[in-house]
Every structure is written in C-alpha cells, then in structure tokens.
Amino acid sequence: MAGRTTFLREYKLVVVGGGGVGKSALTIQFIQSHFVDEYDPTIEDSYRKQCVIDDEVALLDVLDTAGQEEYGAMREQYMRTGEGFLLVYSITSRNSFEEISTFHQQILRVKDQDTFPVVVVANKCDLEYERQVGMNEGRDLARHFGCKFVETSAKVRINVDQAFQDLVREIRKYNKEQQTTGRMMTGGGGGGPPGTYAGKDPNDEGAGGCCGGCVVL
C-alpha cells in the first residue's frame, strides 16, 4: 500500500465553453454529486478530487471557467496551465456548439501545438425536446479534432464521470506519445509524430470503467 501512495499524479483539467451551457453544473455534479439548478455566471472556480481511473490513482485539479465574453482576457492564462480541456456546449444551443471550434483553435494557438488533449462534451442531453444540435454533428466535430465525444446531462447525471475520466485518459495517451517522440529524437524506439492520435477513431473505443473510490479534497 505504501508503494501506491508514494507518487500521486495531478492532472490540471479545464472546463471551457460558452455561457449557460452547464459547465458549473457538470463540474459540481462530478465533484460533489448534486445538481445546481440556478444559473449564476462563473468567473473562475477550482475544485480538487482524488479518483482511481483504470487502476491508477489520480488527483484531479478541475478549473471551472467563465463563458461570458467579458472574461475572455482570462482565457489565455488558464489555457497556458491546463493539461486537458473539456469543450462543453449545450445540445439546446447551436451558437454554443459553433463556439467550440473557436475555443479549440485558441487552445492550440496558446499551446503552440497541432493537437492537444480535449474531449467534446454535449451537455443537457436530458432536454431532447429542445435539441438544436444533432449527436452526429458533435461526433463529427470531435472526429475532426481527433478526440473523444460524449453526450452528458448534469441534471440526471448521465456520462458525467465518463467525460472527466476520458479526458484523463487522453492526457495519459498524449504524454506517452510525447515520451515516445522524445525517444525517437534521441535514437529510441518507434512511434508517431508529436501529439498525433495514432490508430482508430477514439470514439470507437469502449466507455471505460466507472470512477471508483473518488475523494473530494
């Protein structure tokens, strides 16, 4: 047991998206397991939670960010420090869906990378009767980004854990690929070019296990 606790990997996750898409509700449902009904625009909130994901302990540092345009100047700061990003839109708002590409482009520009760990999250899937964005549109956008896609509901807790777990998995995969590339540049073994997601469409993979033994810190 002592060996398992000698090193606790911390992951800096950032939740981004337009105003009113449910970023805070999604984050609080994941961290505290309850739904926040009232809409109170966020400036910036940070949460920590310890989880076991794929038999590996992870300390998640989750930053819930402002969606309002007046706080746009703060974006580059958290984009510089984030290791992975949940790109959240609401299925009831086409405008929020169209904003996702802008957020993604800004992340790549700030990181100076061709690709970076992200997951496209279509929130409010419980409001099917108000849907403006089809599931296939979200899946196609994620495929274009080379990342995973998941539809969620913070209200009834659908796929909430999966969204955050999938982002941690994307970060782990990205870091391994970067290490492989580093070994190649120093004469090591094979691998793909920096930041590429080799193999099949990430959305063809299984949903993965549930998050066991999570602790809010």
UniProtKB/Swiss-Prot annotation:
Main location, first listed in the record: membrane
Tree of life domain: Eukaryota
Motif segment (Effector region): 39-47
Residue numbers spanned by region Disordered: 181-200
Cysteine methyl ester found at: 214
Enzyme Commission designation: 3.6.5.2
Protein name: Ras-like protein
Native organism taxonomy: Eukaryota, Fungi, Dikarya, Basidiomycota, Agaricomycotina
